[in-house]
């Protein structure tokens, strides 16, 4: 039976009067005090011969299990199965194929290297936690888990996600794949229109999908700590109009897309640890409002470009300048006052015939010519 190891564990601790089937718990009646203490037994007043109620939850967490023997239980009646914190290396294909009414499966913190293809038979599965294993990939059949709302695959060795992951999992609300080795996210991920949380930090992401605006319900996006890999964000990121939190910290991003200035619902922006040039780091350190205003003005062409003005010639106000006195062998520097021009003009205009007296090169640079005080 699937609870054989649990029974042996209880025998070692003097709990011989407990039955193996007591690991089957109905949480709707009364929650167990511990994984080893059953809530229902054949002698308990709340015991019900209705097998469908009795076999609602199976909790085998922290039992030091190394394998799962072929169970003789009616697995079709189990709604929740917790096999976390064990030493399990493989999930039998026959097990998942018979869990027809399973809603939640927790196998985190084991030694599993691959999920069975029969996981696609879990058409009612809503919560799947496979974090803390040695998974390199997820089976393509996971797309058949169309009721899935939460997928946690943190702390694995995932190199890629299934290409079709976004085509069928239209009910997925939370996708956590942090602390893996992902280089990119599949393009179909933008089809997850119900997605609210996307956590892809601590990976090797080099690029994000272009059509992020399709994630119309996304509220939290975390792509931080991809370090030397992620150097740019797609402009479509600013079209995530329902986004509340954006974490892009500790990457190689130098420019924030101007479209971020349109994200009026954004409440938190974390961008530290990036070599930002636009907006300047001093703007980022001020506030989220300052960043939004900077990017909005830049997008609308209202941002003052001081660097461009330095390349123009002309005078905006009366200034002091120096000339050399040509009447003496010893050249002495004298300060003179320049002219006030109404606006900036390039040097080719200043040297034209429109300004023959006041601004010709001969008048400007001759050592024997002076401006009056």
From Swiss-Prot:
Annotated keywords: Leucine-rich repeat, Repeat
UniProt repeat feature LRR, residue ranges: 52-75, 76-98, 100-122, 123-145, 147-169, 170-192, 194-215, 216-240, 241-264, 266-286
Repeat listed as a keyword: yes
Start and end residues of each stretch annotated as Disordered: 25-49
Residue ranges annotated as motif GVYW: 291-294
UniProt-listed InterPro entries: Leu-rich_rpt, Leu-rich_rpt_typical-subtyp, LRR-SigEffector_domain, LRR_dom_sf
Transcription recorded as keyword: no
Source species, domain of life: Eukaryota
One Pfam family linked to the record: LRR_8
UniProt tissue specificity: Specifically expressed in flowers.
Function: Leucine-rich repeat protein that likely mediates protein interactions, possibly in the context of signal transduction.
Record-linked PANTHER family: LEUCINE-RICH REPEAT AND IQ DOMAIN-CONTAINING PROTEIN 4, LEUCINE-RICH REPEAT-CONTAINING
Family: Belongs to the SHOC2 family.
UniProt name for this protein: Plant intracellular Ras-group-related LRR protein 7
The gene coding this protein: PIRL7
